[in-house]
């Protein structure tokens, strides 16, 4: 019966580790199969980042810089009046918190009301910004808009 301690890999299933740099007689002595000189013969070979181009000025430096990031930019989450008309009851006061409760924005987001869609109900809408068409539609429906900071 075969015991665990008797088990061995099948002949040819394993390979001896190549021991390089162990003398001329081994066939892998002196330069250890790496050839003479150059980057590929040195230790640390092939550890260059993918953007390294061998000392040539890399692409990211050859291409000109464009534009800038405005550090004071204010980003708004857009909400259309048509969506407000569908989701809310007539006469409600709409604030960013109310919009967040319906999943239209996050509570911390700045909200901009846009004028896409029809507005048939009367609302008091408080938001951080309004488009011109949204203001007109809110007033036309008999509602009010108010900018909050």
UniProtKB/Swiss-Prot annotation:
Ribonucleoprotein recorded as keyword: yes
Species: Aquifex aeolicus (strain VF5)
Gene Ontology terms describing biological process: translation
The entry's keywords: Ribonucleoprotein, Ribosomal protein, RNA-binding, rRNA-binding
Biased composition (Basic residues): 31-40
Family: Belongs to the universal ribosomal protein uL15 family.
InterPro entries according to UniProt: Ribosomal_uL15 (IPR030878), Ribosomal_uL15/eL18 (IPR021131), Ribosomal_uL15/eL18_sf (IPR036227), Ribosomal_uL15_bac-type (IPR005749), Ribosomal_uL15_CS (IPR001196)
Gene3D superfamilies per the UniProt record, alphabetical: 3.100.10.10
MF (Gene Ontology): rRNA binding; structural constituent of ribosome
Job of this protein: Binds to the 23S rRNA.
Protein name as it appears in the record: Large ribosomal subunit protein uL15
GO cellular component, one term: cytosolic large ribosomal subunit
Coiled-coil stretches noted in the UniProt entry, renumbered to this chain: none
SUPFAM superfamilies: Ribosomal proteins L15p and L18e
Region of interest (Disordered), residue spans: 1-64
Subunit structure: Part of the 50S ribosomal subunit.
KW RNA-binding (keyword) present: yes
Intrachain disulfide bonds: none
